[in-house]
Amino acid sequence: MKKYLWIPLLGLGLSATAQTGTKTYLLDEAPRYSEETGYGYDLVAPPAKDSKSPFFFSVRVPDGNYKVTVRLGSRKQAGITTVRAESRRLFIESVPTKKKEFIERTFIVNKRNTHIDGNEYVRIKPREKRKLNWDDKLTLEFNGSVPVCESI
């Protein structure tokens, strides 16, 4: 029986490698998401200055595990920020920051689409087609009473 338990556990350990390479996105300078840029504000309009509205930021990436670091805070206003990724998976909940205070938080996000290999695809239900975890983008949602983020 022990033989059968070790095989699945070993497989899980091997599949948990994070992607290599680092890219920083400054949100003050970020465009609206487009296929040409491959990153930017997505799903709703980019937030106006001193906005209290939630916003989404997407980056086109291949399937895999990604180590994401967000720098929460703003030079202009205090905030309370919650961060979710893909299909509303909660990673950071209600982190308060004072004006000109910055807090970095890091987490691992797994990003997948429906393509497996060659001609193999995951079959999804019609209601799942609108979900954020079945596209070619890693999408982060910034929410809270006053969501503030300087960079990703």
Question: What is the predicted role of each segment?
Answer:
Residues A18-I152:
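Compositionally biased, intrinsically disordered or flexible polar/acidic segments
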Residues Y4-G13:
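Sec-dependent N-terminal signal peptides
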